[in-house]
From Swiss-Prot:
Protein name: Methylthioribulose-1-phosphate dehydratase
GO biological process entries: L-methionine salvage from methylthioadenosine
Function: Catalyzes the dehydration of methylthioribulose-1-phosphate (MTRu-1-P) into 2,3-diketo-5-methylthiopentyl-1-phosphate (DK-MTP-1-P).
Family annotation (Gene3D superfamilies): Class II aldolase/adducin N-terminal domain
Ligand binding (Zn(2+)): H97, H99
InterPro entries the UniProt entry points to: Aldolase_II/adducin_N, Aldolase_II/adducin_N_sf, MethylthioRu-1-P_deHdtase_MtnB
Subunit structure: Homotetramer.
Cofactor(s) the record lists: Zn(2+)
Pathway where this protein functions: Amino-acid biosynthesis; L-methionine biosynthesis via salvage pathway; L-methionine from S-methyl-5-thio-alpha-D-ribose 1-phosphate: step 2/6
Cofactor binding summary note: Binds 1 zinc ion per subunit.
SUPFAM superfamilies (alphabetical): AraD/HMP-PK domain-like
Gene of this entry: mtnB
Annotated GO MF terms: methylthioribulose 1-phosphate dehydratase activity; zinc ion binding
Length: 212
């Protein structure tokens, strides 16, 4: 029970911080944190909640299938399946899914992936070589959630990572809440920088074409 309370507090603090950045507009987004590994349980944001508010109903505990562990009238977020795929296939400890203007713009500029390079902040992703290059996959935003989940699952390749969904934000996961938040901040910095650079240069770089 102590672990549940500790993780609830940790997730609540992350929600507060991301809210101050306006990364949950119009109740969008969802975040989760692992509570136990065996059996797998995790806390996830309840569906349709105003994340600028803090209430006792912000999160609910679900199992490896995303089913509530305790009887509740709350519903887990619609994209809970993305979280279950991550937790069931990795040792990740936290998953963050946010909608920002920048990450949505990026998915309209590129088709299957965006390539970013030569930025010092890439080291926040545990990539240390000089002039490092990263590739972030972009998948289509299917309204059929199982199809979205299956396409998403193909890009889960470790205890940390990120996937962009076209016009539907980014999902980032990490070893724990600190790692996940650090990675999310790094990706959003890279997106913002890239878009500003393109606005100065007047075109899409990396050899990619504008996607629509």
């Amino acid at each position: 029970m102590k672990q549940l309370f500790r993780q609830w507090y940790d997730l609540s603090e992350i929600k507060k911080e991301l809210t101050t950045r306006n990364w949950f507009p119009a109740t969008s987004g969802n975040i989760s944190i692992k509570v136990s590994h065996e059996p797998l349980t995790f806390l996830i944001t309840a569906s349709g909640k105003d994340k600028t508010k803090t209430t006792p109903d912000d999160f609910l505990l679900v199992d490896h299938l995303g089913v509530p562990v305790l009887e509740t009238e709350l519903r887990p977020s619609a994209e809970t399946i993305l979280h279950t795929h991550i937790y069931n296939n990795t040792n990740a400890g936290c998953v963050l899914h946010v909608h920002t203007t920048d990450n949505n713009v990026i998915t309209n500029l590129y088709s299957d992936a965006v390539t970013l390079q030569n930025q010092e902040i890439i080291k926040a992703l545990d990539i240390w070589e000089e002039g490092a290059t990263i590739h972030i996959p972009i998948i289509e935003n299917h309204s059929h959630i199982p199809t979205l989940g299956e396409n998403f699952r193909k890009h889960i390749q470790g205890d940390s990572g990120a996937v962009l969904i076209r016009n539907h934000g980014i999902t980032v996961w990490g070893r724990d809440s600190f790692d996940a938040k650090k990675r999310l901040e790094a990706y959003e910095f890279l997106f913002q920088f890239h878009i500003k650079l393109l606005s100065i240069q007047g075109g899409v770089s990396n050899g990619a074409n504008s996607y629509s």
